[in-house]
A protein has these predicted regions:
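Short, solvent-exposed coil/turn segments at beta-strand boundaries
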Residues: 98-102, 172-178
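A short acidic-to-branched-hydrophobic micro-motif
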Residues: 93-119
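Secretory targeting and sorting signals
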Residues: 1-34
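Surface-exposed amphipathic alpha-helical segments
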Residues: 19, 75, 120-132, 177-207
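Second-shell loop/turn segments in exported
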Residues: 82, 108-115, 144, 184-191
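N-terminal "mature-domain start" segment
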Residues: 46-90, 198, 203-207
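Sec-dependent signal peptide cleavage junction
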Residues: 25-44, 50
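Signature of long, low-cysteine stretches enriched in small and polar/charged residues
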Residues: 70, 76, 80-93, 126-173
Length: 207
């Protein structure tokens, strides 16, 4: 597998895990392709775009919530509807692929404090593992507050084709939404991944 196809696959799987993780049941695997495409049990391929300078990052807005973030190019959008107790919750993930790894954010239409953020993180790890058959573990987990909202930071790590994988994730509990910001890629690109994640967080806006 080439370096580019590997990072493409990581971005796709991270987006799928973030969306599916919004649901409580471990069997919740409903995943929709971009708008207009038929439903499928697995996410569609991620479009690979060349890396662009930081000055060319594009602000991407989630229309239903108004939540936005800057991403390095035009984002690939994915949607999912996940069962939570007696209701269906809509989620959307906006991701972009770079030569260094995948980056993106996801929004679930549910109160961010409906479940502890630690449980949400565990569902993300479990969803990724379910999709890849490779364990994803979290390190350096810490609670914080972002603009008055509860948040949780962690560093996920795994393996992909024998290569170490690392990244960063932030979960934010808004009154009406659960927000994820994720960066994931080969450990060899850790410095670039950290810089991308910092820029992603700096540009994240929750109305």
């Amino acid at each position: 597998m080439t370096h580019r196809s590997r990072t493409q696959r990581l971005a796709m799987l991270a987006a799928a895990a973030a969306l599916i993780a919004g649901g409580v049941p471990g069997s919740a695997t409903a995943f929709a392709a971009p708008s207009g495409a038929p439903f499928a049990p697995a996410p569609p391929p991620v479009t690979v775009l060349a890396a662009v300078p930081a000055a060319d990052w594009v602000r991407t807005t989630d229309p239903p919530s108004g939540i936005s973030a800057e991403l390095p190019g035009k984002a690939t959008v994915r949607t999912a509807t996940v069962p939570i107790e007696d209701q269906l919750v809509d989620g959307r993930a906006y991701g972009e692929e770079t030569p260094d790894g995948g980056i993106g954010f996801a929004v679930h239409d549910m109160p961010g404090d409906q479940y502890p953020l630690e449980e949400d993180l565990q569902r993300f790890l479990g969803s990724y593992t379910q999709n890849t058959a490779k364990p994803l573990t979290s390190h350096d987990v810490r609670k914080l507050t972002v603009d008055g909202r509860p948040a949780l930071d962690a560093r996920p790590t795994s393996q992909s084709d024998g290569e170490p994988v690392t990244g960063s994730i932030r979960l934010i509990a808004d009154d009406k939404h659960l927000v994820w910001a994720i960066t994931l890629g080969p450990q060899a690109n850790e410095k670039a991944l950290n810089a991308m994640h910092e820029q992603l967080l700096a540009g994240l806006r929750i109305p």
